[in-house]
Regions:
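Active-site lumenal/periplasmic loops and adjacent helix-entry segments of GT-C-fold
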Residues: 37-175
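Start-transfer (signal-anchor) and selected internal transmembrane alpha helices
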Residues: 1-45
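Membrane-interface transmembrane helices that cradle and orient dolichyl/undecaprenyl
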Residues: 177-182
Length: 182
């Protein structure tokens, strides 16, 4: 093999990227750190993968997913499980859980709800916060490193919707905010 060409050159470039703290591999490492921290935090308040929260509103949200599965309608305009006709209730979270259930073939609503919760906290929130910080700090390394840790240290965002009552729609909306602000 030729020196300095092919996979060896790419491998060295990737290693330099990781060590120097610049480039896509370094960003992937920061994201993985932040996602892991968020996952640990979320895992601390569920007893088992298919357990559901014993706080306010949980049964409503689990039943809303069941209602969508049973009726086939995920429209906020026609959701009348407990609301009066003509009332609008945000079903983005419930639709996401239902879609995940249908695509995965899983049958347990609590299990899929927890899986989506982990995905939103670990993937959506951390990706959005790190990307927004990169945009606001002109990709300065110190800003991205601090954000990777602090994204999981802020107790109110987005986790307040999970710890106080179960406010899944607010949790999803809060997790989406950094990406929307880009």
């Amino acid at each position: 093999p030729a020196r300095g060409g092919g996979w060896s050159a790419r491998g060295r470039a990737a290693a330099r990227s990781l060590v120097s703290g610049h480039g896509p591999l370094a960003d992937l490492g920061l994201w993985a750190l932040s996602a892991a921290l968020m996952t640990v935090i979320c895992a601390r308040f569920i007893n088992a993968p298919d357990a559901f929260s014993q706080t306010y509103d949980t049964i409503f949200h689990l039943n809303a997913v069941r209602w969508i599965l049973d009726t086939g309608s995920a429209s906020s305009l026609s959701f009348d499980m407990v609301t009066a006709r003509g009332a609008i209730y945000p079903l983005g979270w419930h639709t996401l859980v239902t879609l995940t259930m249908r695509l995965s073939g899983a049958a347990s609503i609590p299990l899929v709800t927890n899986a989506v919760m982990f995905a939103v906290a670990g993937l959506v929130w951390t990706s959005g916060v790190i990307a927004l910080t990169g945009a606001l700090t002109a990709d300065r390394r110190a800003g991205r490193v601090a954000t990777a840790v602090l994204a999981s240290a802020a107790p109110a965002f987005p986790l307040l919707g999970l710890f106080w009552g179960i406010l899944y729609p607010m949790f999803l909306a809060t997790a989406l905010l950094p990406g929307i602000l880009l």
